[in-house]
């Protein structure tokens, strides 16, 4: 992960987003940005050395690391929910007071990381190595870097004595990568700590970068809902040398073939419509016209083919189905008693899970195929763009990247944002780094 001027834009976004004036208030004390960035790099490298692989998580050590760092800055942080979350796990909460004239803003990140196969890395995955301007480590992209950027932004404002009209709330959750139990527990148990929070930002932004130039900054206002299913067919076990008609494997394969060939309907949500209208400025001629009115353009075969050829655009315009796992016999010469498949289904925010499931069962058209949910879809949301926070990001982005614009985006993956959105908080995904979506997706759970 390369750090490129991330502290100043993020800090100023916070400061400019708090008062109503056009520009951020000046610090009472000078802020040495280069020194602060060097310090942020050092803190991030130390944070990456805390192994918080999930499972099992062990985020309590990470929470203590953050608490101790904040304590050195005179910011008291609380470690919460160690009993509820189980051994080695915890939430972290801190608050920097403003003058209270406006509601608070929350900066949230998750402390856990996905497993890393050390044999596939060129460096130890928990070394926090700095090489050729890049920091290597599991979590450098997802999302310890943004967590430290958030903390250093708050530290910059505090050291600079920048007057705040809103409290700044810092939250670090465990278990985002597995079950979101950290955010769920925090939102359920500590809603009183969030009652005055108007805006919350965390991961989930999508930027477009070309040749190190930011084309647009995508603020995540929604995300798709995870609706994983297991499909199972039962049969009679027997020796494979004598084929039977109730072998569950070919019956399951036939069902999966029908599912794989099914084209889910296209649907344009309001945030996605704005996204296409905004990015149309980067596409001259006919293609720009298609994007400016994407709903009607999808009825044009040529426009439809071009638009859906982009895997991200395709994913934000429909529910998606990916066949990801198969289980049959554990021996070649045995017809198994059961065959199953796991299917990754992602729903657009405004889609009804029960209706989608009924449609998929009709597509499979076989009552012998049993559908079992593997995960309950989270609360759907689409946050507003006509807000002080969104306008603050637009102002600061113009100051630092005048040629780039800000738009709303939909995340095709999942975050902890729904846990907080159901409390009435406007939640946003913000990527403060100059990282394009292709590199981000390749590296976020990948090697090095």
Model region roles, listed by residue range:
Residues 21-28, 206-215, 219-448:
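Metal-dependent amide/peptide-bond hydrolase catalytic core
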Residues 53-55, 87, 98-101, 111-115, ...:
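Solvent-exposed loop/turn segments at secondary-structure junctions
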């Amino acid at each position: 992960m390369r750090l490129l001027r991330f502290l100043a834009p993020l800090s100023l976004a916070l400061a400019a987003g708090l008062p109503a004036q056009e520009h951020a208030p000046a610090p009472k004390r000078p802020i040495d940005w280069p020194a602060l960035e060097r310090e942020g790099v050092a803190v991030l490298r130390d944070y990456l050395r805390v192994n918080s692989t999930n499972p099992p998580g062990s985020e309590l050590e990470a929470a203590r690391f953050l608490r101790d760092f904040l304590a050195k800055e005179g910011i008291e942080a609380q470690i919460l929910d160690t009993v509820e979350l189980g051994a080695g796990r915890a939430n972290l909460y801190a608050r920097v007071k403003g003058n209270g004239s406006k509601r608070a803003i929350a900066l949230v990140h998750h402390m856990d990381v996905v497993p890393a196969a050390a044999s596939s890395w060129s460096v130890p995955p928990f070394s926090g190595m700095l090489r050729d301007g890049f920091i290597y480590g599991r979590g450098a992209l997802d999302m310890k870097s943004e967590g430290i950027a958030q903390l250093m932004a708050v530290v910059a404002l505090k050291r600079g004595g920048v007057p705040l009209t809103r409290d700044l709330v810092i939250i670090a959750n465990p278990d985002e990568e597995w079950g979101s139990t950290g955010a769920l527990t925090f939102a359920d148990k500590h809603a009183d700590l969030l009652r005055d929070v108007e805006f919350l930002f965390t991961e989930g932004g999508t930027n477009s970068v070309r040749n190190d130039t930011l084309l647009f900054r995508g603020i995540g206002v929604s995300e798709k809902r995870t609706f994983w299913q297991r499909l199972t067919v039962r049969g009679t076990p027997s020796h494979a040398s004598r084929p039977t008609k109730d072998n569950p494997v070919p019956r399951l394969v036939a069902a999966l073939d029908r599912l794989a060939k099914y084209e889910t309907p296209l649907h344009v949500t309001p945030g996605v419509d704005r996204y296409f209208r905004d990015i149309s400025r980067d596409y001259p001629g006919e293609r720009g016209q298609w994007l400016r009115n994407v709903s009607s353009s999808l009825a044009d075969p040529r426009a439809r083919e071009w638009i859906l050829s982009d895997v991200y655009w395709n994913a934000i315009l429909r529910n998606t189905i990916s066949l990801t796992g198969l289980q049959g016999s554990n021996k070649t010469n045995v017809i198994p008693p059961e065959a199953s498949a796991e299917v990754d289904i992602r729903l657009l925010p405004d889609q009804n899970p029960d209706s989608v499931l009924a449609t998929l069962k009709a597509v499979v058209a076989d009552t012998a195929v049993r559908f079992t949910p593997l995960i309950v879809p989270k609360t759907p949301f689409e946050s507003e763009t006509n807000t002080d926070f969104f306008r603050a990001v637009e102002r600061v982005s113009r100051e630092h990247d005048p040629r780039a614009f800000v738009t709303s985006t939909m995340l095709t993956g999942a975050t902890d944002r729904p846990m907080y959105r159901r409390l009435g908080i406007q939640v946003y995904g913000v990527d403060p780094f100059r990282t394009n979506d292709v590199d981000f997706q390749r590296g976020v759970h990948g090697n090095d």
